[in-house]
UniProtKB/Swiss-Prot annotation:
GO cellular component: autophagosome membrane; cytoplasmic vesicle
Complex formation: Interacts with ATG4,. Interacts with acetylated ATG3.
Family annotation (InterPro entries): Atg8-like (IPR004241), Ubiquitin-like_domsf (IPR029071)
Subcellular location: Cytoplasmic vesicle, Autophagosome membrane; Vacuole membrane
Protein name: Autophagy-related protein 8
PTM note: The C-terminal 7 residues are removed by ATG4 to expose Gly-116 at the C-terminus. The C-terminal Gly is then amidated with phosphatidylethanolamine by an activating system similar to that for ubiquitin.
GO biological processes: appressorium formation; autophagic cell death; autophagy; positive regulation of macroautophagy; protein transport
The keyword Phosphoprotein appears for this protein: no
Lipidation (Phosphatidylethanolamine amidated glycine): G116
């Protein structure tokens, strides 16, 4: 999925910003969180987050749910490079595995599992 944030900000500017953030806040991870384009779920009010390194994916999902005021009975899925990350994984480990070359971790969210059942292991 194409990132609007990437489209709106040149690579060098994004990279410099991510480096500045990582130097100033060594225990935080710069995250860009955007809605999957065709999803009918609410659009988030801000895209850029400074996430504590020890936060789990599940805790981050909780933050997103609150920001978009999603009712408890509604589903939300988050994706990192079109894959569902494990809920118990630390954001720091997801960052190390999937950070973009500009230094940000890009996460998308949707009200439906738009990429299918990607958490199965492929043999």
């Amino acid at each position: 999925m194409r990132s609007k944030f990437k489209d709106e900000h040149p690579f060098e500017k994004r990279k410099a910003e991510a480096e500045r953030i990582r130097q100033k806040y060594t225990d935080r991870i710069p995250v860009i969180c955007e809605k999957v384009e065709k999803s009918d779920i609410a659009t988030i009010d801000k895209k850029k987050y400074l996430v504590p390194a020890d936060l789990t994916v599940g805790q981050f999902v909780y933050v997103i749910r609150k920001r978009i005021k999603l009712s408890p009975e509604k589903a939300i899925f988050i994706f990192v490079q079109d894959t569902l990350p494990p809920t118990a994984a630390l954001m720091s480990s997801i960052y190390e595995l999937h950070k973009d070359e500009d230094g940000f971790l890009y996460i998308t969210y949707s009200g439906e599992n738009t990429f299918g059942d990607l958490f199965e292991e492929v043999e």
